């Protein structure tokens, strides 16, 4: 995906009791195990945006944002993430939004992850052309 492009990722998910994270990785670099991610953390009733690796001590390059989010196990949820250059916005169930910027890594690689048990469905990726 060229840097100037805008893209959107949508997916639905349900999770089982005890699941700690359902997330989407953005601009991840497998060679150095670094990137960004939006992570839904049902046990903590929040959605977070993190840059990884997470440094054990404070660092000016550390990024951490969060919003409260109350979901229930075994209920259908929808996630939409829109990325334009360095800007990313995550919408959950059209009720919670979390926006950020991503400056340090720009690999344009994405991924989905689950820590626990969850079902992901209706996974869609759309790249927007200029003027769309």
Task: Show the residue positions of the predicted features.
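Extracellular glycan-recognition regions
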Residues: 1-132
């Amino acid at each position: 995906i060229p840097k100037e492009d805008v893209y959107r990722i949508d997916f639905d998910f349900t999770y089982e009791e005890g699941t700690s994270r359902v997330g989407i990785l953005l601009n991840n670099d497998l060679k150095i195990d670094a990137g960004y991610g939006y992570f839904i953390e049902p046990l903590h009733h929040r959605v977070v945006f993190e840059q990884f690796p997470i440094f054990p001590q404070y660092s000016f390059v550390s990024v951490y944002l969060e919003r409260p989010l109350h979901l229930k196990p075994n209920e259908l949820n929808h996630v939409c993430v829109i990325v334009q250059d360095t800007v990313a916005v995550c919408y959950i169930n059209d009720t919670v939004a979390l926006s950020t910027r991503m400056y340090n890594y720009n690999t344009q690689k994405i991924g989905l992850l689950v820590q626990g048990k969850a079902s992901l469905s209706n996974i869609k990726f759309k790249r927007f052309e200029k003027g769309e």
